[in-house]
Amino acid sequence: MKICAISDLHGHLPNIPECDVLCIAGDVVELVVQRDSDESDKWWSVTFVNWVDKLPCKKVIVVPGNHDIYIERLYDGLDKDITLQQFKDKISILTDDKVVFLIDELYEYEGVTFYGTPWIAPIHWQKWAFEDTNHEYDEYKCPYENIPECDILITHENPNYNEKLEHCCFGKYKHHFFGHWHNGISYGHLNQYNCSILTDSYIERERLKIVTINLEEHDN
């Protein structure tokens, strides 16, 4: 199975190589609409869906990030017009079942297991989505403790900047995709991949190279 991975799109919707699965590790929505629920819903339902329709892959797996504020509002049940499940179903229908959202969930596709979790350490500047409010106050509460063994782990947070995530995911994945810190470090020998397509200045990288792996049958 050929798998590509990107993160930190912030509304930039790149071309990708032909593959079986595209994984998106958070911060998908455009910056100018991220705090407007109506405009965010429209962006997901029209702009994102139209892009997905043209992608040369069979499945798109999305894990939200801290800028995907509308998704967290749905997760928290704060939107009176639509639930998270209804939103997921809508995007699935509009993309002919091509898109799957994962929030602390395990998903299996063609024998390969994917687990996604969006949580990050608190930023302490403005209010952002999926901030782990227990991060600094209770070492025994952790949103990452339910990470299971899986083939592909997708997190928005970078484990090299979050000791809880690093501890909880160690040895549980074959490949780990993440972003959040646009120019953050990753270690190829650990099968870690920083998938951000933007620089710290929110500019698309020159000569962008999409993270791509080939998962062979004997790797499963």
Regions found by a protein language model. Give the residues of each.
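Active-site-proximal beta-strand elements of phosphoester/diester hydrolases
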Residues: M1-H10, C23-A25, G111-A121, D151-H156, ...
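Conserved beta-sheet core of the metallophosphoesterase superfamily
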Residues: K59-V63, N158-N220
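Structural motif
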Residues: Y109-E110, I213
